[in-house]
């Protein structure tokens, strides 16, 4: 029996239309699922939409439609886009479906039956935007996740004993380090749990748009318990049907939950705790990717900087978008999207490198060998250059697999394109067009070896890249005379398997070069879509909440007015606002040896700060550490990132290495320095 592989996207919240931020997650999952199928795995790929909650209820009321009408429309747009993009999902779950309602209520019953749910009352703040109960002081206090004003809620609730799982969760993270990936997110989650867990309200009585609590229909189940359960309900959990039960037993637990970094807490703290409480196995790995930025800012409807996947597809095709997102963005880190960068990457890697390799290799086989793959020379007649390509190809097969399995898609593709570059150089160095002009038998054999080597390398690149650029590689496969690439299994991928005498298919360009007009067309299409596709719902981003205020950076502080001897007044000093913050995330800035990107909790919000402390501090050593932050500086960009604040540190020694300011006593986050 084939190994099973179950992968999921997050289910997308239907408060706005899909854009390439959603496409990024879905493309990554689709590529992983495709490669698993090529490996022969029994693969199940799930996506869908999250359709309940107070935010949807209010948005529908503001639009003058029912919640069901709103969710039907937006869910249809998500499904339609995935179908247009050729996304190979096996199921599309909607949380308004009866099968999901049945499964969520069964999840609630199991958790309650195991003694982890009790009834109480909640009085405090609630963020409608994030569908999140928050610890905040006073009415309209800002949400620590998104910064928006919270609402005061006082109602009877059911509570989940989240506090009972603190030790079990920490043990999970320690014993299974790959449960949360990348490591920066794992450190962030561990710091959060070590800070102490409070019991979680998991029902509402003041809204109606949701799934009723079993045996107590006045209560609606908390939207995150509802939403997270989709990973189980879609494969049969809670169904009375025996086939559904067998399906759940076969595919669960999930092998990969792919999510955006903004919903790490819900998936890595709440979800495993819910499953432990229900007595169900845990997913094997939760992989959190970074944000996709548009010209250095996070995409959001309120900013008006959303880019729709259809815009790129209409001009450059599916493969261009898929390749750019997985090659350009280092998975797990934030990545930047722009039309200029997209076209540059398309022309460089796809049109020039791979497209050129395919076109000239197949064209020369067509011309010199009547469209049949030639017979290569025996080993004794091969040159070191021939053997080097064969060796590089075998090494690439191995390195690609290792990098891909570690979710390093960009580096895996870089390895594959190194082979493309090596073969293009091999063709230039060996000049098959010149060899073809020689009439002797030895030259004919040499020409055959050169073109066989190039064609075999092209076959290997096509097989490796197929999960990323499926349309183009399917066409290359057919042009090589190999038929339908979906029948190929990666276990058979090794050098020398291309059979001589194979008749080529019709040879045509795979990636025509794009000019500057492509950029202009995409920009115009985006402007038109922005004005004509205004969604009839309240403005808000599509997936779950953003935990960081929009990326911002550290400028030099405006210098207070000084006297002639350099002293400033107490009033001037009072203008500088310094607060205690706690580092939640720390990671290196690509291409900058001295810079770290930090996410710092200052009590009222989480700030992104770029700090020049990398020479003195390893990123992992900073997570959970308290620092002093100047919080009222104007934002400034460093290395394409914005920093909103400045870390206070001393400059020590001849090299001026930074030493962070700290406290001998414990000081609460958000405390102001005076």
Question: Where are each of the predicted segments found?
Answer:
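N-terminal catalytic cores of NTP/NDP-binding nucleotidyl/phosphoryl-transfer enzymes
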Residues: 2-74, 93-109, 113, 130, ...
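Structured secondary-structure scaffolds
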Residues: 2-47, 99-103, 146, 152-367, ...
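Helix-rich, typically C-terminal accessory recognition domains appended to large enzymatic cores
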Residues: 119, 341-378, 389-503, 510, ...
């Amino acid at each position: 029996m084939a190994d099973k592989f179950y992968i999921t996207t997050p289910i997308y919240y239907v408060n706005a239309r899909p854009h390439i931020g959603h496409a990024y997650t879905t493309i990554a999952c689709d590529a992983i699922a495709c490669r698993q199928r090529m490996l022969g795995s029994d693969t199940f790929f799930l996506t869908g939409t999250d359709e309940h909650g107070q935010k949807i209820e209010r948005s529908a009321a503001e639009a003058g439609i029912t919640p069901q009408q709103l969710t039907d429309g937006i869910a249809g747009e998500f499904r339609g886009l995935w179908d247009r993009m050729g996304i190979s999902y096996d199921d599309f779950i909607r949380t308004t479906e009866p099968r999901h309602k049945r499964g969520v209520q069964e999840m609630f019953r199991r958790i309650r039956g195991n003694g982890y749910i009790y009834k109480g009352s909640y009085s405090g703040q609630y963020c409608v935007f994030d569908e999140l109960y928050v610890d905040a002081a006073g009415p309209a206090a800002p949400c620590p996740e998104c910064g928006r004003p919270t609402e005061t809620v006082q109602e009877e609730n059911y509570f989940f004993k989240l506090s009972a799982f603190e030790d079990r969760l920490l043990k999970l993270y320690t014993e299974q380090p790959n449960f949360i990936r990348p490591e920066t997110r794992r450190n962030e989650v561990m710091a959060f749990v070590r800070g102490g867990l409070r019991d979680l309200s998991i029902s509402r009585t003041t809204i109606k748009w949701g799934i009723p609590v079993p045996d107590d229909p006045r209560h609606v189940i908390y939207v995150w318990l509802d939403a997270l359960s989709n990973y189980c309900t879609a494969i049969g959990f809670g169904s009375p049907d025996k086939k559904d039960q067998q399906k759940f037993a076969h595919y669960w637990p999930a092998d990969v939950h792919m999510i955006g970094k903004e919903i790490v807490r819900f998936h890595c703290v709440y979800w495993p705790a819910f499953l432990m409480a229900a007595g169900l196995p845990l997913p094997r790995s939760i992989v959190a990717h970074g944000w996709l930025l548009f010209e250095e800012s996070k995409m959001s409807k309120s900013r008006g900087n959303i880019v729709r996947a259809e815009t790129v597809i209409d001009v450059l095709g599916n493969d261009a978008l898929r390749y750019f997102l997985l090659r350009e963005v280092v998975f797990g880190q934030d990545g930047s999207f722009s039309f200029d960068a997209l076209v540059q990457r398309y022309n460089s890697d796809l049109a020039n490198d791979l497209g050129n390799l395919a076109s000239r290799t197949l064209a020369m086989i067509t011309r010199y060998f009547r469209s049949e793959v030639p017979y290569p020379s025996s080993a004794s007649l091969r040159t070191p250059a021939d053997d080097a390509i064969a060796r590089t190809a075998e090494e690439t097969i191995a390195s690609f697999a290792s990098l891909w399995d570690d979710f390093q898609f960009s580096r895996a593709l870089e390895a594959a394109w190194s082979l493309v570059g090596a073969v293009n150089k091999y063709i230039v160095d060996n000049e098959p067009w010149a060899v073809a002009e020689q009439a002797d038998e030895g030259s004919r054999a040499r020409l055959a070896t050169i073109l066989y080597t190039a064609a075999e390398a092209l076959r290997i690149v096509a097989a490796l890249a197929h999960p990323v650029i499926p349309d183009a590689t399917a066409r290359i496969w057919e042009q090589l005379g190999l038929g339908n690439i979906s029948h190929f299994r990666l276990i058979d991928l090794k050098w020398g398997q291309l059979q001589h005498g194979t008749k080529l298919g019709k040879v045509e360009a795979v990636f025509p070069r794009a000019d500057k007009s492509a950029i202009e067309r995409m920009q115009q299409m985006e402007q038109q879509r922005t004005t004509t596709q205004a969604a009839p719902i309240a403005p808000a981003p599509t997936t779950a909440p953003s935990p960081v205020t929009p990326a911002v950076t550290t400028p030099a502080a405006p210098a207070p007015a000084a006297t002639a001897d350099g002293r400033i007044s107490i009033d001037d000093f009072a203008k500088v606002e310094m607060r205690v913050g706690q580092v939640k995330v720390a990671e290196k800035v690509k291409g900058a040896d001295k810079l770290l990107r930090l996410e710092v909790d200052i009590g009222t919000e989480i700030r992104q700060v770029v700090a020049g402390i990398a020479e003195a501090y390893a990123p992992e050593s900073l997570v959970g550490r308290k620092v002093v932050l100047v919080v009222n500086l104007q934002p400034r960009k460093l290395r394409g990132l914005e920093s909103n604040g400045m870390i206070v540190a001393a400059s020590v020694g001849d090299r001026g290495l930074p030493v962070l300011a700290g406290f001998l006593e414990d000081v609460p986050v958000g405390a102001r320095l005076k």
